[in-house]
Curated annotation (Swiss-Prot):
Keywords attached to this entry: Carotenoid biosynthesis, Cytoplasm, Isoprene biosynthesis, Magnesium, Metal-binding, Protein transport, Transferase, Transport
Compartments (UniProt record): Cytoplasm
Protein name (database record): Geranylgeranyl pyrophosphate synthase BTS1
Organism for this UniProt entry: Saccharomyces cerevisiae (strain ATCC 204508 / S288c)
GO molecular function: (2E,6E)-farnesyl diphosphate synthase activity; dimethylallyltranstransferase activity; geranylgeranyl diphosphate synthase activity; metal ion binding
Main location: cytoplasm
UniProt site (Important for determining product chain length): 107
Family recorded in the similarity comment: Belongs to the FPP/GGPP synthase family.
Keyword Cytoplasm: yes
Gene this chain is encoded by: BTS1
GO biological process, one term: geranyl diphosphate biosynthetic process
Function noted in UniProt: Catalyzes the trans-addition of the 3 molecules of IPP onto DMAPP to form geranylgeranyl pyrophosphate. Required for the membrane attachment of YPT1 and SEC4. May be involved in vesicle trafficking and protein sorting.
One Gene Ontology cellular component: mitochondrion
Amino acid sequence: MEAKIDELINNDPVWSSQNESLISKPYNHILLKPGKNFRLNLIVQINRVMNLPKDQLAIVSQIVELLHNSSLLIDDIEDNAPLRRGQTTSHLIFGVPSTINTANYMYFRAMQLVSQLTTKEPLYHNLITIFNEELINLHRGQGLDIYWRDFLPEIIPTQEMYLNMVMNKTGGLFRLTLRLMEALSPSSHHGHSLVPFINLLGIIYQIRDDYLNLKDFQMSSEKGFAEDITEGKLSFPIVHALNFTKTKGQTEQHNEILRILLLRTSDKDIKLKLIQILEFDTNSLAYTKNFINQLVNMIKNDNENKYLPDLASHSDTATNLHDELLYIIDHLSEL
């Protein structure tokens, strides 16, 4: 017995592919129905400026996919979501403890991949710093979003507070992707950092998601009808409605919005009532749609290349890349 213990403690921990398969089940479940690959398509387009070699690009893509899908596992637990991509969420199949552990495990698997991006110590240190900074930002934003929801009506965020939260929550993974690529890029001819562009893209992405959750049938089939209301989420239209009714002194409507959010209801009729308030009483859905279009136009009308890559000396590349990026933006503005 002592010999076996001695052998055990003098070697690395034993791990098998069978063990790996077991603890990866919640993660593999979410992969059964892939997402729309928006982030991977964006990486491919941005790499037309960054010019990362294929091996590095593949690793960055893998890091992003691991982080994105793992964050969805945690999101679904935090939101008590029944559906993800039209199928039962992982935590309802494998349990909350296993799903949390798997998601956290995949975060560290993603961190482990960073070491494969370079053998140069200063660059590796920079990449790990970027990784840590943006995961911290992501959790800060997610934490605020949850706090506002779970302790409503203690804090009713303003639009500015909401946008700052999204810069952390949604912007974190967008920025992590871009900053890794910029740090690794052998090219410098794009003229300026694309972080402002990616920040704006992240804001558009999140507000559009908030809007479609209340309006889009396809999203209803994948996540459940107006699931943000069941969650009690302070999404962009809800934030506008609460501030609008408060400013206008519409106490009855203000309290009704709060009441429905606090119900955490799955009742379709009650959720439709709140949507009607947002549609007709506070005009919050129209305001949200208009706000998205304003943000999109900041990019589409960017004649000075404040946000888009500056590729004046590479006119063919610039034209094609700008067209592709504007196509992505147009897709995000389809409501």
